Design a protein with these regions (language model features):
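C-terminal motif of bacterial Sec signal peptides marking the signal peptidase cleavage site
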Residues: 15-18
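Solvent-exposed coil/turn segments that connect beta secondary-structure elements
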Residues: 31, 41-43, 84, 152-156, ...
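Juxtamembrane boundary at the C-terminal end of a transmembrane helix
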Residues: 249-255
Length: 255
């Protein structure tokens, strides 16, 4: 996938007429699976280059899913690659998803019982410093270009520097066309959680059992004779203490 990304990014540097649209994106499911999306569409003048990129992408990744796309006068392809989890994706992803020395840390994971926290620290460098003439030419040729990076999350991001964020905080978008045209650097950052639903359910089940036990022994303590009631009160207090302790611990770990 890294070779594919490098080839794809060369698309931005072509000196050609016409407009085009390039989008890179990720969809991360609540189970942690990752679907990597790429879209390359352009005018008829770019058809040979787009077809060549498609062929090379398929050679580099046999699991690549390719779909033809037509949007008005623009034609091209969408590419999808699936990964079982974020860790696997981070191993194979290249380009701005990878770490670059002294620039960014790439993708980092911080594991805990109820959730894993992920830091996406991505980096993209535009063309080297350009002369005024080269900048003017690039702006003229690429004025209608769209080059975005998008991330779809199952839960709202904890923090991000995205240029666009949806109202629910789950959709993030960064615009790279300006950096591509004028040169410079773009740092893309997002922090988000992936919750362990099985562990949440297991913890909730244990808390319910402790609560039911507390209620059961509390009732028994009120209905039995004095001697038996002392034993039931002791058990009630033990289970109540465990329930409160586990609830407090869970609340602390979640926050």
């Amino acid at each position: 996938m890294k070779k594919f990304l490098i080839v794809a990014l060369s698309f931005i540097c072509l000196i050609c007429a016409g407009c085009f649209e390039v989008k890179f994106g990720l969809t991360i499911t609540d189970s942690g699976a990752v679907i990597q999306h790429s879209k390359f569409i352009g005018t008829a003048a770019l058809a040979p280059q787009i077809e060549a990129w498609k062929n090379q992408a398929e050679e580099n990744n046999p699991n690549l899913q390719v779909k033809a796309v037509v949007e008005g006068d623009l034609r091209g392809y969408k590419f999808d690659v699936s990964y079982p989890d974020v860790e696997t994706f981070s191993k194979y992803a290249g380009g701005f998803y990878a770490a670059h020395p002294e620039k960014n840390s790439g993708i980092s994971r911080y594991a805990s019982w109820f959730f894993d926290t992920y830091d996406f620290d991505l980096y993209f460098a535009g063309a080297p410093e350009l002369t005024a003439f080269e900048t003017t030419v690039n702006q003229a040729l690429l004025s209608q270009a769209v080059f975005d990076v998008e991330i779809n999350l199952p839960y709202a991001a904890d923090s991000t520097n995205a240029d666009e964020v949806s109202a629910d905080g789950k959709y993030l978008k960064w615009h790279l066309a300006h950096v591509t045209i004028n040169g410079g650097e773009k740092f893309m950052q997002a922090r988000f959680k992936l919750w362990h639903k099985d562990k949440l359910a297991a913890t909730a089940a244990v808390e319910l059992l402790l609560l039911f036990a507390t209620i059961f022994f509390a009732i028994k303590a009120h209905t039995e004779d004095f001697e038996a009631a002392k034993d039931f009160r002791f058990k009630r207090n033990v289970f109540a203490g465990l329930f409160v302790a586990l609830t407090a611990l869970a609340a602390f770990m979640i926050h």
